[in-house]
């Protein structure tokens, strides 16, 4: 069974805290089968899990960043709310979406560096 980066991170958290899947099922309020599907990338990671995992495991800032990164890198889709943005920001989002599949690695890295500078 292949796990997503999030799945691996979550399993390590459970092991470090001597918990099994059933324990996570209880505090997340979902079935063990659902958690397993999320860990393997068959189901989307529910947004509320980040806060639940941070609270349950008492994650520090570094661990929170690691968890957020694992969640982000495990996502299959990304949604943007462009309801309250400027027309230029909206054009940027739409153009990025249209061009994304054709971006080469060098251009993607350049865009990433620009965005990191402005974050």
What do these predicted ranges mean?
Residues 14, 25, 54:
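The alpha-helix within a helix-turn-helix
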Residues 10, 38-39, 49, 57:
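DNA major-groove recognition helix of helix-turn-helix
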Residues 11, 22, 51:
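Residues within the helices of the helix-turn-helix
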Residues 1-16, 106:
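A short, Lys/Arg-rich alpha-helix, primarily the initiator
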Residues 65-101:
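Short, charged recognition helix plus adjacent turn
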Residues 48-66, 73:
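DNA major-groove recognition helix of helix-turn-helix/homeodomain DNA-binding modules
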Residues 28-45, 52:
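Recognition helix of helix-turn-helix/homeodomain-like DNA-binding domains
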Residues 18-36, 67:
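Short alpha-helical DNA-recognition segment
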């Amino acid at each position: 069974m292949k796990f997503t980066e999030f799945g691996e991170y979550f399993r390590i958290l459970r092991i470090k805290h001597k918990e099994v899947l059933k324990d996570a099922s209880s505090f997340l309020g979902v079935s063990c089968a659902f958690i397993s599907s999320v860990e393997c990338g068959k189901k989307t990671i529910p947004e509320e899990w980040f806060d639940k995992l941070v609270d349950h495991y008492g994650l520090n800032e570094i661990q929170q960043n690691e968890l957020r990164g694992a969640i982000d890198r495990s996502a299959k889709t990304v949604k943007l709310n462009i309801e309250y943005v400027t027309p230029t920001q909206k054009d940027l989002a739409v153009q990025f979406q249209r061009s994304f599949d054709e971006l080469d690695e060098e251009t993607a890295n350049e865009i990433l560096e620009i965005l990191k500078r402005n974050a």
